[in-house]
């Protein structure tokens, strides 16, 4: 959102919503579009369908990503986050397993039967990305905004691990994300854990900073 009642856009940059889709259902469509870009990249490498996919970081992007992994045919989706409430929400949204980063089950190295086939990091944190790289057999994609350099070394190279950056978001990705919503394969409404009038913007920001909220939906005219 733009934290305003009205925002001008070029008409060609807008998507018309189907009559059956509400504004609440697509309030986070821009985020879903961005996550879709990463899944389009993974799909080109056949890294989702039939694979054991890990999602690192269960903020809004991670909660979108785990649903997309299911929609695109992942055999199993493993959600990783240190916050219990976010792991619980991930399970409600369909993750097969939700674990803390220090969970022994999650500590499997890449040669372990429980290792991941592919993974998507949604945190941008070095510790998360490198943990995924150590536990993934084929591909690790980085969606989260990278905050510091990560180490891709000889061990990753010798076993053929692929590390993907992020491509530009685009209209096609937005249309694909919208189609997942229409088909009932992507539910964005649980991301908005709080709803406030726009006049209480500062309160909403504090809820986000303190991690009491995942996303805050502001009502422009309330």
Regions flagged by a language model, labelled:
Residues 171-222:
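C-terminal hydrophobic helical "lid"/dimerization subdomain
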Residues 3, 82-89, 148-153:
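Short, glycine/polar-rich helix-capping loops at beta-to-alpha or helix-loop-helix junctions
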Residues 126-183, 220-222:
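Glycine-rich phosphate-binding loop and adjacent beta-alpha segment
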Residues 117-120, 141:
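N-terminal Rossmann-like NAD(P) cofactor-binding module of classical short-chain dehydrogenase/reductase
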Residues 50, 95, 114-117, 137:
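Local beta-strand N-terminus motif with an aromatic residue
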Residues 1-15:
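Glycine-rich phosphate/adenylate-binding loop and adjacent beta-alpha elements
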Residues 22-103:
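Mid-domain Rossmann-like dinucleotide-binding core that forms the NAD(H)/NADP(H) cofactor-binding site
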Residues 103-114:
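Short amphipathic alpha-helix with an adjacent loop that forms part of the alpha/beta core around
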């Amino acid at each position: 959102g733009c934290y305003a009642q009205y925002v001008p856009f070029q008409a060609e940059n807008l998507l018309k919503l189907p009559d059956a889709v509400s504004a609440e259902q697509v309030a986070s469509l821009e985020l879903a579009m961005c996550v879709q870009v990463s899944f389009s990249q993974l799909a080109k490498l056949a890294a989702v369908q039939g694979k054991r996919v890990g999602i690192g970081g269960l903020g809004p992007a991670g909660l979108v990503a785990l649903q997309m992994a299911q929609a695109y045919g992942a055999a199993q989706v493993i959600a990783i986050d240190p916050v219990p409430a976010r792991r619980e929400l991930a399970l409600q949204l369909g993750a097969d397993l939700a674990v803390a980063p220090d969970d022994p089950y999650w500590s499997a190295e890449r040669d372990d039967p429980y290792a991941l086939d592919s993974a998507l990091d949604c945190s941008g944190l070095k510790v998360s990305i490198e943990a995924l790289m150590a536990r993934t057999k084929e591909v690790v994609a980085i969606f989260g905004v990278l905050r510091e350099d990560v180490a891709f070394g000889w061990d990753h190279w010798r076993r053929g691990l692929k590390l993907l950056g992020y491509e530009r978001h685009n209209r096609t990705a937005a249309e694909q994300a919208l189609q997942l919503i229409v088909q009932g394969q992507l539910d964005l409404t649980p991301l908005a854990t709080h709803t406030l009038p726009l006049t209480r913007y500062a309160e909403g920001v504090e809820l986000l900073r303190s991690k009491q909220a995942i996303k805050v939906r502001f009502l422009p005219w309330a």
